[in-house]
Swiss-Prot record:
Entry function: Located at the top of the head of the 30S subunit, it contacts several helices of the 16S rRNA. In the 70S ribosome it contacts the 23S rRNA (bridge B1a) and protein L5 of the 50S subunit (bridge B1b), connecting the 2 subunits; these bridges are implicated in subunit movement. Contacts the tRNAs in the A and P-sites.
Organism of origin: Cytophaga hutchinsonii (strain ATCC 33406 / DSM 1761 / CIP 103989 / NBRC 15051 / NCIMB 9469 / D465)
GO cellular component, one term: small ribosomal subunit
Protein name: Small ribosomal subunit protein uS13
A Pfam family the protein falls into: Ribosomal_S13
Alphabetical UniProt keywords: Ribonucleoprotein, Ribosomal protein, RNA-binding, rRNA-binding, tRNA-binding
Length: 125
């Protein structure tokens, strides 16, 4: 397995797909990285020679924010929204959907597991 940006990328897959295992790199950026490095997209990672792997590593290190640096930047921007008290920050703080989705029926992913309320026994007449 090749190791790029602290992530083991699979050898048996095409380079374009393998690079998407790195947080912060999708299909489009993987294609542009491979084009700049002069590596064919369809070439499997196991077929890369050392020069190609080093070229890909250098491009990712110089031009892209990945893994820990990107995650910390995202966390800092969310924290900034919460600190300034804007609507998006309040939604993050409350654990509700941020982008205007309805919350009456759905949004279970964001709210978490249902919190059931105990039924009161019906008063007997």
């Amino acid at each position: 397995m090749a190791r790029i940006s602290g992530v083991d990328i699979p050898d048996n897959k095409r380079g374009e797909v393998s690079l998407t295992y790195i947080y912060g790199i999708g299909r489009n950026s993987a294609q542009s990285i491979l084009t700049k490095a002069g590596v064919n997209w369809d070439k499997k990672v196991s077929e890369w020679n050392d020069d190609e792997a080093n070229a890909v590593r250098a491009i990712i290190a110089s031009e892209h924010k990945t893994e820990g640096a990107l995650k910390s930047e995202v966390q800092l921007s969310i924290k900034r929204l919460m600190d300034i008290g804007c609507y998006r920050g309040l939604r993050h703080r409350k654990g509700l959907p941020v982008r205007g989705q309805r919350t009456k029926n759905n949004c279970r992913t964001r709210k978490g597991k249902r919190k059931t309320v105990a039924n009161k026994k019906k008063a007997t007449k």
